[in-house]
């Protein structure tokens, strides 16, 4: 894995009136990184992700993507430049099939936009890319099924496939196993583990088994500030991290190293 920094947040601050939601947060992702962001409920993880993706403007601080300042770019422009976030299922087109959905996303990413509706099945390159993603995410058996009829685990796989259709340099993977039944988790976890090595991944997840099996580095956020950063082994053995999780009565405490 290269040590080149792909995504960098420097001194990020976000205030809502008199409330400080993030406090001078620094975060760096290297090329091909497998990095996890963890913290108890209310730690500021969602605010930080919204800052990185442009949903919220920072009160102070700077965000760079491959050395370019993106602090004030729109979410759409950040996606175009390669910073992509997975979105939860209610933002998918429930009446569309996975094949239609991925063909639409691929078409839009390639600048074809609305022409997709009149060209479905006619663009071989778009179709091939959509079918490749369906194969990669083991969705071939439901490719012609309405999304609303798919098992929940398959829908979560489709969310990740949609993000990869945007050809990200950095993928923000937002709680991929949340709500997934136990019987559907294994396939999802295997797919997450097999994400392309050239894509830097920031995982936001409460499932500590997934976090510790996936991440090569971890950042712990508490009360809007970075408590510590390190390898999974360093995080697991840090008494401050354990105290924070036990103090917040998390359903899954940090595993012992």
Question: Where does each model-flagged region fall?
Answer:
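Glycine-rich phosphate-binding loops of nucleotide-dependent enzymes
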Residues: 2-257
């Amino acid at each position: 894995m290269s040590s080149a920094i792909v995504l960098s947040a420097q001194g990020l601050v976000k205030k809502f009136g008199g409330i400080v939601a993030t406090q001078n947060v620094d975060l760096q992702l290297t090329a091909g990184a497998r990095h996890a962001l963890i913290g108890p409920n209310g730690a500021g993880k969602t605010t930080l992700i919204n800052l990185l993706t442009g949903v919220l403007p920072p009160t102070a601080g700077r965000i760079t993507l491959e050395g370019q300042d993106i602090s004030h770019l729109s979410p759409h422009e950040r996606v175009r430049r390669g910073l992509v976030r997975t979105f939860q299922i209610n933002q998918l087109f429930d009446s569309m099939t996975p094949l239609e959905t991925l063909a639409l996303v691929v078409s839009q990413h390639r600048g074809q936009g609305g022409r997709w509706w009149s060209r479905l099945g006619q663009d071989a390159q778009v179709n091939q890319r959509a079918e490749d993603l369906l194969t990669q995410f083991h969705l071939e058996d439901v490719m012609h099924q309405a999304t609303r009829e798919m098992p929940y685990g398959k829908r979560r796989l489709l969310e990740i496939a949609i993000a990869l259709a945007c050809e990200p340099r950095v993928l923000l993977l937002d709680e991929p196993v949340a709500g997934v039944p136990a019987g559907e988790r294994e396939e999802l976890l295997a797919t997450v583990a097999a994400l392309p090595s050239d894509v830097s991944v920031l995982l936001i997840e409460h499932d500590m088994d997934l976090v510790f099996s996936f991440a090569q580095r971890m950042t712990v956020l508490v009360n809007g500030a970075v408590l510590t950063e390190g390898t999974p082994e360093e995080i697991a053995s840090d008494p401050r991290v354990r105290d924070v999780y036990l103090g917040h009565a998390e359903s899954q405490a940090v595993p012992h190293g």
